[in-house]
Every structure is written in C-alpha cells, then in structure tokens.
Amino acid sequence: MNRIYLLIVALFMMLASCSNSNDDVEQGENSKTNKESIVALWQDSDKEPENVVSFAKDGTYKIILKKSDYSYFFSTGRYSVNEGNVSCKDNFVESSSKEYPFSIDTNGTLRFEGIALKKIGIEENALENKLNGRNQKYGGYTMGGIGYTSGEANYYVNFTNDYTAYKVFEKIYYKEPSKNSSKQTLMHYVYFDNHLYLAEEDHSYSPKYVVDLNESNCFYYINDKGEKVLP
C-alpha cells in the first residue's frame, strides 16, 4: 500500500514539474524582456514616426516620445536591462533618468510607455548623424538704419559631437570690430530622420524641427498659424 502511495505521489510531482516547465516556456515565448531582445531601432510607424527608441549593443540609448504637437521628450545615455525593466541613465538631465518596464510580444512588437513600437533595424546604422561636427548657420539679420548697414547678427548651432551642441548668437560690426559679441548656450540634441530635437542642457523637451540644410533657415517647425519658428 505504501509503495502504491509513493508511486502516486512521485507521478503527481513529475506531472506538476512538467506543467511548470511548459508554463515557463510559454511565458518566455509570449514576452521577451532580456537585453538581447531589445537591441534594435523601434518606431511607431514605418513612415514619419512620432515615437522612436533605440538601444545599441554598446549600452547606449536614444529615446524620442511625442507629448503634444510641439513638445517631444528626448533622452540619450546608457542603459541596463533587469527583469523586464530597462534602466536609462540620461547624459544631461538627471530627472530624465528613468526605469521603464517593457515587453516584446510574440509578433515582435515592443510595448514601451504604453506605445506599440515596431522593430525597424539595428541601432548602429539607424541613427546616422549628419550634423556631428557642423557649425551650421540657421538664421540672422542685418543691423543698421535707413540707407546704411552697420553689421549683421547671426544664429548658429555648433554640433560638437553626437549629443552636445552650442547655440550661438553673434553680432558683427563692420567698422567697429571692438563691439563684436558672441553668446553661447550649451545644448543637447538628437538628430533623426531629417529632424532635430534640441534643448538646453537642463531640459528634455523640444519641438520637432525640420532639418533642411539647403535652406537659409534650415532648422524650423511650422506653428498653428503656419509660421516658421526657429530654435
């Protein structure tokens, strides 16, 4: 009798173990949350995406999330993955460092901040930065009065690397160079898909600026009045 009882208990435990094992496999198939699974470029649309996240093999990330028509949250820095959460340490704004829960469905959809994102490609080539190293003039005006010009004022963005830039406002006086002046403001930015997201070092929100280097006003967005607005 005892032998029969022990056999029944052993059989029950074996069946329970198999069931738990199958549940673990099914759970793993339904949702992936490891580092290897998140390494990619993700967008909410194939064309004209409004929400973009990118995680690279080297541990760096870029995030662009639309908050309103003229306000996008953006962040760059380093990340780590642990138990279904990706911890993002922002390069510039401490308050923008955050831990995000995420999951990847069996159909390959990334669930991030309540947004469904599609895998577009690998990060290394997806966010090619055409602005790195440029000192780009994007606006300006002449100074003077009726019938004469005393100088000019110019707006530049000096892109020092992939993440950091300086917004520069300079005044040049043709006949009085001692009055020349230049003001620099430290900025951080993300360039993606011919658009620029640019903010001062302690801010993380930006309009979505169009980038057209063939135009004199090459960084701009169109407001609700149909007007071009420069940085």
Which residue ranges define each predicted feature?
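C-terminal motif of bacterial Sec signal peptides marking the signal peptidase cleavage site
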Residues: 14-17
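Short beta-strand-centered aromatic/proline hotspots
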Residues: 77-79
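Lipid interaction determinants
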Residues: 21-74, 85-186, 192-231
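Sec-dependent signal peptide recognition
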Residues: 2-9
